């Protein structure tokens, strides 16, 4: 037995991985992939034939799902790539704070107050205008690799 103290860093997640491995050759257009540490949606995949030295290669062109930037990567088709766990959840919009955060109602009846307004100008305008007009709005929140962002909005009628 030692007299040393053990310090453990507590983490918010339950240890679930933010990504899972998938063979590059099986990733298709409209699928997801991690490029340069960012979760992306694949917009184009091309495969080169096996050369004199080496494997067939997959050329991925993808768009970052949070900031919209275009990223590219070339991976041997037999190698594994990281694929992000992407979740989409709908919440009802309750309030917009002055500091740019939204208050959302979860399915369980709790509030979620840790999400910022969207950075996309047209989506931001839709959210603000709809809220000011007193509409009942449902926002779609995409989450992947520890990031969350509002990416769509639905009008479910006017508040009574």
Curated annotation (Swiss-Prot):
Top-level taxonomic group: Eukaryota
Region span, Disordered: 1-21
Molecular function, one GO term: translation initiation factor activity
Keywords, sorted A to Z: Hypusine, Initiation factor, Protein biosynthesis
Any one Gene Ontology BP term: positive regulation of translational termination
Basic and acidic residues bias (residue ranges): 1-12
Disulfide bonds: none
InterPro entries cross-referenced by the UniProt entry: IF5A-like, IF5A-like_N, NA-bd_OB-fold, Rib_uL2_dom2, Trans_elong_IF5A_hypusine_site, Transl_elong_IF5A_C, Translation_prot_SH3-like_sf
Similarity comment text for this entry: Belongs to the eIF-5A family.
Protein name (Swiss-Prot/TrEMBL): Eukaryotic translation initiation factor 5A-3
The organism of origin for this protein: Solanum tuberosum (Potato)
């Amino acid at each position: 037995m030692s007299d040393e103290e053990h310090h453990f860093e507590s983490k918010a997640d339950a240890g679930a991985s933010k990504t899972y491995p998938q063979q590059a050759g099986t990733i298709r257009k409209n699928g997801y992939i991690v490029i340069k540490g960012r979760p992306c949606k694949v917009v184009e995949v091309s495969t080169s034939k096996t050369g004199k030295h080496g494997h067939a290669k997959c050329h991925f062109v993808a768009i970052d799902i949070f900031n919209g930037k275009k990223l590219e990567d070339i991976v041997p088709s037999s190698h594994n790539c990281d694929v992000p766990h992407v979740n989409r959840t709908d919440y009802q919009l309750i309030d917009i704070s002055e500091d740019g955060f939204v208050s959302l109602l979860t399915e369980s009846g709790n509030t979620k107050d840790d999400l910022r307004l969207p950075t996309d100008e047209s989506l931001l305008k839709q959210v603000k205008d709809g809220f000011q007009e007193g509409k009942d709005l449902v926002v779609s929140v995409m989450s992947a690799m520890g990031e969350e962002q509002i990416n769509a909005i639905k009008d479910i009628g006017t508040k009574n």
